[in-house]
Amino acid sequence: MTNDNLCQIAMKFLHRNGFKVVFGARFQTVNTTGEQPDAIDFRHEASCLIEVKVSRSDFLADRHKRFRANPHLGMGDWRFYLSPMNIITVDDLPEGWGLLLVKGQRVCEMHGWPSNGVWSSEKPFIANKQAEWEHMYSALRRLERLGHLDAIHYGYPKKLKHA
């Protein structure tokens, strides 16, 4: 299983679980911390970051990143590692982190995934909103440069009426 495969699984998982603005690893930005999320999404009053790990050594190296050693610098009010089975255990997790385990092409086990009513009230982290803002701003700036930003001024398309 490759990093790209796992990133796609993470993005689909977020989308299926109520997060509708998913940014994946291919979306690279310049921000104050240098963090490049494998998958991050935003819903009303909460953000969720998924960090993909394909190997144990990759997971162990992650803790040395500046925004992991200093959690207040990182993105995500909720943070999860996603990996194939038998790479990361619940006992390995840093405080506040959850774990999503993949078998085949789907998340098969979840540790720390909250129920819908908890996303805004029991956040384990106070995300670096400046870094998140920079991430979203970069997306909007790219849309503007491509000439697509005007489309947001027109609202949702009206549903077609069938005769």
Provide a role label for each language-model segment:
Residues 34-49:
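Active-site beta-strand-loop-beta-strand hairpin of nuclease catalytic cores
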Residues 1-16, 91-163:
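Non-catalytic C-terminal interaction segments of nucleic acid-processing enzymes
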Residues 47, 53-102:
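Catalytic cores of nucleic-acid endonucleases
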Residues 22, 40, 100:
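Residues in well-ordered beta-strands of folded domains
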Residues 31-36, 56:
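A short, well-structured beta->alpha microelement
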